[in-house]
Amino acid sequence: MKKKTIITLVLSFATLLLVLTGCGNSGSKSSSASTKSDSSSTTSGKITAVGSTALQPLVEKAATNFQKKNSKVNITVQGGGSGTGLSQVQDKSVTIGNSDIFAEEKQGIDSKKLTDHKVAVVGMAPVVNKDANVKNLSMEQVKDIFTGKITNWKDVGGKDEKITVVNRAKGSGTRATFEAAVLKGAQAVKSQEQDSNGTVQKIVESTPGAVSYLAFSYINDKVQPISIDNVKPTDENVESDKWKIWSYEHMYTNGKADGATAKFLDYMNSDEVQKSLVKDMGYISIHNMKVQKDSKGTVSSK
């Protein structure tokens, strides 16, 4: 009887140990998962990024992805143009000013107060309504169209149709980049002006004879991109500077970035963004460039 009791006690004790061990292991896994979850959401804060509409789609998508991993960070992305972005980040009314141009190029901006974070490169190209029946122009012809010297598509081998120029607003970095590369100081013809790449794309698509220019990320099969001097507007040609109309995409902060803003900007330069998202959305990674450009527009080999 005693022997049976002892065996029963031993078995009961062993069972108790197994239960306690199981509970202990279960608690460790839960604690580990909890710690991991907590660490992924320790970054918190509110970020407002305003400016370039050329850069806007990339920042919007990156912000969405970043917030999935950092649920305590709230990011608002808006357009308005590069000039607006630079002015507002200088005034500290926004966290980040998105721009297609260097701060040094914008009158009224003290670039010494701002910190430049280059996150991508964007190519830009003339685009026409498909009805114009034009696919290639010389750089001189492009200049003559946007300065008003050429007013009919038949004069450059296209349809007998009046040219309707659609320009960007004066605060646009896309416009500044295009005019620096193409007009080179010449006065643009008076024409309608639009505030965003998206609006321009829709107008060119729907208006017979229309011509404008767009960031590569906005060019689709509903408009006709124009080759210049038989050079196609491609990423590869931008990377080597064979295609001359391109700019860096800047995300400026007022002083040094910190907290959630610094972490988001680090994410913008991560492999996840630079090797995947950038290309998927029609931009060019800053790491793929074989040349570099300064604020004066001087291009040199890297």
Per-segment meaning from a language model:
Residues G24-N70, N74, G80-G83, S87-Q90, ...:
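Exported/periplasmic ABC-transporter solute-binding proteins
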